[in-house]
Amino acid sequence: GLKNCILLERSELTSGSSWHAAGNVHVISSDPNISRLMAYTINLYKEIEKTSGHSVGFKPSGGFYLASNEVWHDYLKRERSKARYMGLDQEFISLKEVVEKNPLIDPKHYIAALWDPIDGEVDPSGVTYAYAKSAKVHGAKYYTNTPVLETKQRLDGTWDVITKKGNINAEIIINAGGLWAREVGKLAGVNLPVQPMEHHYLITEAIPELKERGEEKRIPVGTDFEGNIYFRQEGHGMLLGTYEPKSTPWQVNGTPMNFGHELLEPKLENIQDRLAIGFKRMPALEKAGIKNIVNGPFTFGPDGNPLIGPVPGMKNYWVAVGVMAGFCQAGGVGKTIAEWVIDGEPSIDV
């Protein structure tokens, strides 16, 4: 691979969206190629932890996907077929097994469950620093508190990247600007179709049933498709989140340059119907107090999938943006971009 790579971070590593992510990792996706990116990412965590010597905090609890009606049951059947085609180990389990793994669930609301043993959770900060340290081991450099002020292309196709700490002449630019992808793109005259959206999750106080189980019986990650909710254990409580249908676009006219490690004011009215479903299907959550509510922005592409590849009509300018499920997909996205730049095409059709 290429050794002379430089990462420029406008503030500190994890600034923007990474620091407040829930950290769930899974491989199921309606797009099989995205599932491949996710599976690669999860397997990569072991490698970067070993290379960097920095823990990623991976807890492979496994994960199940719950169907409450035949529509979602059929969807899970299709997902299992795709998983088998890709060599992934997903199997249907009984609702009795679901309750054994998560006694908080009321099984009367479900008719089927698909189990994936490699799902789990990671520490977002740990993963970010493990990536950075691993890249450094392999010859890359990264600079924090180095915002890019201008990007100017020379006649030979290379780029002058102007920062407050000095200038860099680069053969190519890869825009992986996250919340600031639009702003970085505009420096080169590129308007990217991505938009930050507000996203909520909450963490409950300790739940007696979880304290009694102990860490060795950690509850798996779970997804309820009809409810559009996801959940996992957090300490002795639970984390409950939703990709809300009534999500609010954030900073349509541009991400503030002084934004970094802030959260947004919760808008519980946007998720109260989702919370009601979660409380109904896991009654213990309704009885538990709420310890924390997180509302933070994530960047989405038009179809919810990452926007990856060379920008048409521009020489030596690439993007890896709109990666809203970064801790599931980032490793695979990085692999795809690296193959595309070095080999001329990626091994996965994106």
Task: Report residues per predicted region.
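Short Gly/Ser/Thr- and Asp/Glu-enriched loop/turn motifs at secondary-structure junctions
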Residues: 59-63, 197-198, 293
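C-terminal catalytic lobe of FAD-dependent flavoproteins
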Residues: 226, 235, 257-350
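Flavin-dependent oxidoreductases
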Residues: 150-265, 273-284
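Helical element adjacent to the flavin cofactor pocket in flavoenzyme catalytic cores
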Residues: 114-172, 180-183
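Dinucleotide-binding Rossmann-like beta1-alpha1 core, especially the glycine-rich loop
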Residues: 23-101, 226-231, 235-237, 265
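Helix-loop-beta segment of a Rossmann-like dinucleotide-binding subdomain
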Residues: 56-65, 79, 99-138, 160, ...
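Glycine-rich FAD pyrophosphate-binding loop
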Residues: 2-19
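Short beta-strand to alpha-helix junction loop
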Residues: 36-39, 66-75, 114-137, 143, ...
